Amino acid sequence: MGAATSALNRRQLDKFEHIRLRPTGKKKYQIKHLIWAGKEMERFGLHERLLESEEGCKKIIEVLYPLEPTGSEGLKSLFNLVCVLFCVHKDKEVKDTEEAVAIVRQCCHLVEKERNAERNTTETSSGQKKNDKGVTVPPGGSQNFPAQQQGNAWIHVPLSPRTLNAWVKAVEEKKFGAEIVPMFQALSEGCTPYDINQMLNVLGDHQGALQIVKEIINEEAAQWDIAHPPPAGPLPAGQLRDPRGSDIAGTTSTVQEQLEWIYTANPRVDVGAIYRRWIILGLQKCVKMYNPVSVLDIRQGPKEAFKDYVDRFYKAIRAEQASGEVKQWMTESLLIQNANPDCKVILKGLGMHPTLEEMLTACQGVGGPSYKAKVMAEMMQNMQSQNMMQQGGQRGRPRPPVKCYNCGKFGHMQRQCPEPRKMRCLKCGKPGHLAKDCRGQVNFFRVWPVDGSETQKFSRRYSWGGANCAPSTESIRPCKEAPAAICRQGEAVEGTKEKTTSSESRLDRGIFFELPLWRRPIKTVYIEGVPIRALLDTGADDTIIKEADLQLSGTWKPKIIGGIGGGLNVKEYSDREVRLEDKILRGTILIGSTPINIIGRNILAPAGAKLVMGQLSEQIPITPVKLKEGARGPFLKQWPLSKEKIKALQEICDQLEKEGKISKIGGENAYNTPVFCIKKKDKSQWRMLVDFRELNKATQDFFEVQLGIPHPSGFEKMTEITVLDIGDAYYSIPLDPEFRKYTAFTIPSVNNQGPGTRYQFNCLPQGWKGSPTIFQNTAASILEEIKKELKPLTIVQYMDDLWVGSQEDEYTHDRLVEQLRMKLSAWGLETPDKKVQKKPPYEWMGYKLWPHKWQISSIELEDKEEWTVNDIQRLVGKLNWAAQLYPGLRTKNLCKLIRGKKNLLETVTWTEEAEAEYAENKEILKTEQEGTYYKPGRPIRAAVQKLEGGQWSYQFKQEGQVLKVGKYTKQKNTHTNEFRVLAGLVQKLCKESLVIWGELPVLELPIEREVWEQWWADYWQVSWIPDWEFVSTPPLVKLWYTLTKEPIPKEDVYYVDGACNRNSREGKAGYITQYGKQRVEKLENTTNQQAELMAIKMALEDSGPNVNIVTDSQYAMGILTAQPTQSDSPLIEQIIALMVQKHQIYLQWVPADKGIGGNEEIDKLVSQGMRKILFLEKIEEAQEEHERYHNNWRNLADTYGLPQIVAKEIVAMCPKCQIKGEPVHGQVDASPGVWQMDCTHLEGKVIIVAVHVASGFIEAEVIPRETGKETAKFLLKILSRWPITQLHTDNGPNFTSQEVAAMCWWGKIEHTTGVPYNPQSQGSIESMNKQLKEIIGKIRDDCQYTETAVLMACHIHNFKRKGGIGGLTPAERLINMITTQLELQHLQTKIQKILNFRVYYREGRDPVWKGPGQLIWKGEGAVVIKGGVELKEYPRRKAKIIKDYEPRKRMGDESNLEGAGGADN
């Protein structure tokens, strides 16, 4: 509140609160209006202190008055409020806002200023007629006149409020979208830097974006100063100086100087245009940041409508900062490339460079029927989440009765208080001073002696946090002593003396009381025998008691203690007895006017009080974690455990609590997760496991910081190596305190002899999804700092495993490793001695490491009589792991054994090929293999070898020694080419080399240069591969056929085709040659694609060594031009074998049904009896329909079942429909109740038109006069026929009339008018006016009267033209929207009723009823419920449905904690 509330004194505030907002209203001004005004000042670059004086208010009025006529409601309210404040400061008696505004207009001479402005405008307009030079208009034709020439002088004309208002509206609506840059260019054309700064200053709510623009301005200004250094020496008298960067930005230059630089300087420097370019650069950067999605990332979803994808694509294109040529290339290549597979198949069939209209037309059905189901599913999900939020909001406790802040009585608010206004402190609540002068704060005190001697300081200790959550502050629970490193017991602090009542004191035995923090830690202490209720404050240095609670005798010294709120005079009594629990201590007591009694550290420290937390380093940063949006924590019951496991869990938890890694909690935490334990590998110890599956579902998603395991072949060769392991890695990193409550778990008691012991984690727990990522990130940041200090060491980290190498001798290396361990220990990361490996071989991540070589840990293949799917999976996994060092391993036939099998325990029958492959692999593994380390600067060579069965093997070598090996299998394609597989293998090699060594290898491939280049010349676009060296290795044999690019002369041409009847599955295939040779065969149980391929096979069989083949099948063309060498299709294999035998083959595709000679003849031969044409008889009817209604081709195609090309041809033959092409119909995103209305003129008559924005449905008629009465009648007609909730019109007098306003009030219609400088405001109605006139022009000859033509045109537009969303007519679309809305409302009602029920359910054979869950759906035999974030299905017999009548309260709600409601609790 600050200065805003101090703008008026008490007397002025009383007068201010008696002024009414409106002359006839009851509401009056309140303090909240002053607070709001203070915050609004920042938007206009004004200080809120200006509200405190009459002169300040006058300055504010001068700024706001030009903007008030066209300003927003908020700006007008601020202007009115400042006028009222001006009158209050001036002691003018006013009753309401209107009187204040009238007084301000007279006092500030605003009326005279308006008259002078009108007079100047009149003189300027008359001067323009007389003076040819007149006003300098910017070249873009903008009406923002920056200056006017009067004689030889230039006078600045500021921007109009309308221009500023349009700029503010544009920014508020577009939010720095791609449209904001052209909008700024249009509005700022010809402006001076002063005008541009004024445009930036009105954007008060976008400080982040303005800061980006400011940084760009500073950079460009610095570049300008470097490129234009100032001249040496002083300037001659009268010469205008050159502008600097700050001058161009308008910070160090006046408006007159800017005008002189622009218009009169020699040479002229257009500082306004230069500054505009700088601002545009900044705005473009803002647009990029506010629209972070790149056009490369715009991809069509599987069920997304193609039109929606196009809209997103072009929106991203507009935000891209690229040239027009680049954007054109992006549109042509990416729009089709990033479409979903369904649309991509359709778009590729359109040929090269299809138009956008053709693409939208072809793909308009994608996402249609299923899109509605998707919307309904999302709505259902939203309703569920809203219902959960509403139910959650009802769990809070009831609000207390209202209390007056002025008099302190209950039952009324401050604004209703009849007593005089009291000036009261907002912090302590006492009268007589303001909050800024308050001295009664409880803060971190520090002693300031009166005599000015040196300040006393108390010793500082580590702050730790231990277990809390006892049910009462008076309950005492013994706890083990904190670690000795934290605080030494019995150590006194600054003159305090400690005395124990007995040797059996709990504090002397190393046990102290624990206090919960769910309420204030207040205890009863005895000071000189007087019981005092005091707050135990570890943050306060001193003990201070209220004068009313304690009166001490004896000598005292005056002191001043300082806090944030100021100094406080106290009395200091030294050496006073204080008894806290069983401890009797002597120390210093301060007596003063404190709001609450405080026991500080001078008493708590000698008493042995400590804040105990786990052994988690306070230096380690805490990573904030939260739940997913709308998710809640786990509420799972603990399942039964055996006595042995309960005892083991209790021992583990006692140790973890002693180390501070977990903390005890009480029943106020409502969350719980089941816990259990298992025996470790050595069977001597237990391991605690917590089932965090439910919490993992609700926790936010994380990204794995480390994406793979470091490979030993990528390590450099080191003379010394050490392998470390961080013990209890997760337990070393603290967990976000706000998230700890969700990790709560319970250890039950045997036979339920007592309540279970509850804990929560203070560190990262095992099994939680966030632990790996947080640990990786935290450990990496710690090691980064250590690496800078221990530069001789090379440290490689993967999770908690560390590989440390160096080139030092053994002694130095061990010393550096010990330093590393000490530094890790200082951060709280321990490295146990038993996990430190100092001698080779080192076991690390499944490898065996030596300083000069590495191996894979021994792998043994089992011999079993019976193998299951799970056994085969484990076997293949072992072989894949071994393949990185053992060359020649194969798994293709082993994988075939489990293809299609899903049950892991299903028995597998071995094939002969798999047994041979298994035996070969066993022989390979018998020979021990080893790899070497990487030598920087030496080239890496990759040798590729082809194995049997389409499998490949490769080796990475360096100086003849093997770094690593691997294997590769062909992709899962039906038709493959080994050269394409080889290209994929090379890509894999290069990617693997870049990941491990960061460089590309020299490739040795089994292929000849000429053979590869012959294939690569035509198929280079299939993938990217690097350059390689062709070496003398066994070449890949050429087993593919040759396709020529030009027809083979003097050879016969075979036109092939095939056809199939879809019902009978019978077909024909054949060919016809240019010399008349032909052959046609009948086929059974075939398809169109198979028939096309069979025709090609027949042509190959009957032709010579050279052949020309022409087909109209893109399917066959696509397969054969890829030159496959093997295929899973027998027919393709036969065609490949025939083509390999040919010397030359020319294969060409032509479009079908285009009248091409041989193709048309063979098509007739194979189509006879197969294909039928059913639409010919409908063409004549369609032509008659179009001559009457002139409907578009979509309507003709749907109504009469015509192909699109036939329907388009009918429209093209009509002379009246060839004025312009067919428009692409698109609809804006609007609700079903939004209409736009406008008046247009035709043949001297007024036509009023209304359009339903979402559907394009129009209502129109001729009205006698353009008046409010006629407009209201027409509006009533629409209201009586269609649902209308919002009406948008322009600012015409008939639309803003009282008749229309009354009709909108009666019909509950929201009426909005057009926005200046916003071309989209009335876009729908303007487009419909144009279309309506075009239709009328086509049918005007058929009717006598204009009124008839208008109604006929409405009928044609609404019922005879299809397009837009769903390919429907506007009438169909409107009815569909209304029906859909009714269905959704009905569905919402059903969902709401269902969600009011709760379900208790049983799972499997578990007799315990669980729940309650939320009922989502109920059928005859099953129900679907929601438990947590999962949807589950249960049989009806295992579910009980009840109605939830009353919301339940949980102890974990924050509203149940004392102190959560404020200081009064």
UniProtKB/Swiss-Prot annotation:
Site residues, Cis/trans isomerization of proline peptide bond: 233-234
Occurrences of domain RNase H type-1 (ranges): 1048-1171
Start-end of DNA-binding region: 1397-1444
Residues noted as binding Mg(2+) 3 in the record, renumbered to the chain: 1238, 1290
InterPro entries per record: Aspartic_peptidase_AS, DNA/RNA_pol_sf, Gag_p24_C, Integrase-like_N, Integrase_C_dom_sf_retrovir, Integrase_C_retrovir, Integrase_cat-core, Integrase_Zn-bd_dom_N
Extent of motif Nuclear export signal: 16-22
Motif (Nuclear localization signal): 26-32
Cofactor note: Binds 2 magnesium ions for reverse transcriptase polymerase activity.
Lipid attachment locations (N-myristoyl glycine): 2
Gene Ontology biological-process annotations: DNA integration; DNA recombination; establishment of integrated proviral latency; proteolysis; symbiont entry into host cell; symbiont-mediated suppression of host gene expression; viral genome integration into host DNA; viral penetration into host nucleus
Activity regulation as described: The viral protease is inhibited by many synthetic protease inhibitors (PIs), such as amprenavir, atazanavir, indinavir, loprinavir, nelfinavir, ritonavir and saquinavir. RT can be inhibited either by nucleoside RT inhibitors (NRTIs) or by non nucleoside RT inhibitors (NNRTIs). NRTIs act as chain terminators, whereas NNRTIs inhibit DNA polymerization by binding a small hydrophobic pocket near the RT active site and inducing an allosteric change in this region.
UniProt-annotated binding residues for Mg(2+) 1: 725, 800-801
Family matches, as SMART domains: ZnF_C2HC
Zinc finger (Integrase-type): 1177-1218
Span of domain Integrase catalytic: 1228-1378
Pfam families reported in the protein's UniProt record: Gag_p17, Gag_p24, Gag_p24_C, IN_DBD_C, Integrase_Zn, RNase_H, rve, RVP
Residue span of motif Tryptophan repeat motif: 1012-1028
Key words, A-Z: Aspartyl protease, Capsid protein, DNA integration, DNA recombination, DNA-binding, DNA-directed DNA polymerase, Endonuclease, Eukaryotic host gene expression shutoff by virus, Eukaryotic host translation shutoff by virus, Host cell membrane, Host cytoplasm, Host gene expression shutoff by virus, Host membrane, Host nucleus, Host-virus interaction, Hydrolase, Lipoprotein, Magnesium, Membrane, Metal-binding, Multifunctional enzyme, Myristate, Nuclease, Nucleotidyltransferase, Phosphoprotein, Protease, Repeat, RNA-binding, RNA-directed DNA polymerase, Transferase, Viral genome integration, Viral nucleoprotein, Viral penetration into host nucleus, Viral release from host cell, Virion, Virion maturation, Virus entry into host cell, Zinc, Zinc-finger
Keyword check for Nucleus: no
Residues under site feature: Essential for RT p66/p51 heterodimerization: 1015, 1028
PANTHER family according to UniProt: ENDOGENOUS RETROVIRUS GROUP K MEMBER POL PROTEIN, RNA-DIRECTED DNA POLYMERASE-RELATED
Comment, domains: The p66 RT is structured in five subdomains: finger, palm, thumb, connection and RNase H. Within the palm subdomain, the 'primer grip' region is thought to be involved in the positioning of the primer terminus for accommodating the incoming nucleotide. The RNase H domain stabilizes the association of RT with primer-template.
Protein name as catalogued: Gag-Pol polyprotein
Lineage, top ranks: Viruses, Riboviria, Pararnavirae, Artverviricota, Revtraviricetes
This protein's encoding gene: gag-pol
